């Protein structure tokens, strides 16, 4: 992996890094900033499409694997949670339409699509303020959490 000593020349998005290194998302090799393990192909795509930033340590570009992202997102939630509000309240507080707000998933940190924000509004789910930013749940994390709750309930029933 190439070294980037000058911060002004560093690409901070994975597709930009690939262009700089003259490679593709499919062929790039990058390590996790937390566990130092090489990201698997699916994790590279999830990192890129999650619109997350590449970080640099001693000029070496690093990303984050999915297990570390989920782990540190939970730590962030536990440490920095401050409040929960409904979508209509969030629009009132910020004086901005819900669709214009930048909201990420609280579990995997991907940006929420307009459809995912609308799902929160229609099902009367709250957005959570964590570390100064409002978060919700993406479609994938929303459905996987529901399945986990169902499995838990089925296991405890006699």
UniProtKB/Swiss-Prot annotation:
Alphabetized Pfam families for the sequence: E6
Keywords: Activator, DNA-binding, Early protein, Host cytoplasm, Host nucleus, Host-virus interaction, Inhibition of host innate immune response by virus, Metal-binding, Modulation of host cell apoptosis by virus, Transcription, Transcription regulation, Viral immunoevasion, Zinc, Zinc-finger
Annotated Gene3D superfamilies: E6 early regulatory protein
Molecular function terms from GO: DNA binding; zinc ion binding
A Gene Ontology term for the protein's cellular component: host cell cytoplasm
Cellular compartment(s): Host cytoplasm; Host nucleus
Quaternary organization: Forms homodimers. Interacts with ubiquitin-protein ligase UBE3A/E6-AP; this interaction stimulates UBE3A ubiquitin activity. Interacts with host BAK1.
Family: Belongs to the papillomaviridae E6 protein family.
Protein's recorded name: Protein E6
Gene: E6
């Amino acid at each position: 992996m190439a070294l980037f000593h000058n911060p002004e020349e560093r690409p901070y998005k994975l597709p930009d890094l690939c262009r700089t290194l003259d490679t593709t998302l499919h062929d790039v090799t990058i390590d996790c900033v937390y566990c130092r393990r090489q990201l698997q192909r699916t994790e590279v795509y999830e990192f890129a499409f999650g619109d997350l930033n590449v970080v640099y340590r001693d000029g070496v570009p690093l990303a984050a694997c999915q297990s570390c992202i989920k782990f540190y997102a939970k730590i962030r939630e536990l440490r920095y949670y401050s409040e929960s509000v409904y979508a209509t309240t969030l629009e009132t507080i910020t004086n901005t339409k819900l669709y214009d707000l930048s909201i990420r998933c609280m579990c995997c940190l991907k940006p929420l699509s307009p459809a995912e924000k609308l799902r929160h509004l229609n099902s009367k789910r709250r957005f959570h303020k964590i570390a100064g930013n409002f978060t919700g749940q993406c479609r994938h994390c929303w459905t996987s959490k529901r399945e986990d709750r169902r499995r838990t309930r089925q296991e405890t029933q006699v």
